[in-house]
């Protein structure tokens, strides 16, 4: 089934000029870029995007990290794109990352893990709509 999912290239990766490498990794794996924009989130936007985590101990540090530098929001499309991209991303936990995944290659820590990806079809729709209008997705 053809799906769309959201990829965020996080501040740790944008600051280290890894945008091109990460996008190449995704395209080489068969995902198509349908929309892309570089964004500087403010506190309110970051809190809104991660609202489901409000109240958790990692929420405030995550928001601070996400507003520390620009991010790149990308809509990816492909066969089973959500699961495919999550496999390419790798685990959040550094000890569980498989070699060759984006996070194994580029992450600095559990929080500074270079990329975000939608975890379900429902999340993908909500997250894509957070950054893109329908006519921005080509």
Curated annotation (Swiss-Prot):
PANTHER family: NUCLEOSIDE DIPHOSPHATE KINASE, NUCLEOSIDE DIPHOSPHATE KINASE DDB_G0292928-RELATED
Record-given protein name: Nucleoside diphosphate kinase
GO BP terms, alphabetized: CTP biosynthetic process; GTP biosynthetic process; UTP biosynthetic process
Top-level taxon in the UniProt lineage: Bacteria
Organism lineage string: Bacteria, Pseudomonadati, Pseudomonadota, Gammaproteobacteria, Pasteurellales
Family: Belongs to the NDK family.
Organism, scientific name: Actinobacillus pleuropneumoniae serotype 5b (strain L20)
Coiled coil: none
GO cellular component labels: cytoplasm
Location within or outside the cell: Cytoplasm
Cofactor: Mg(2+)
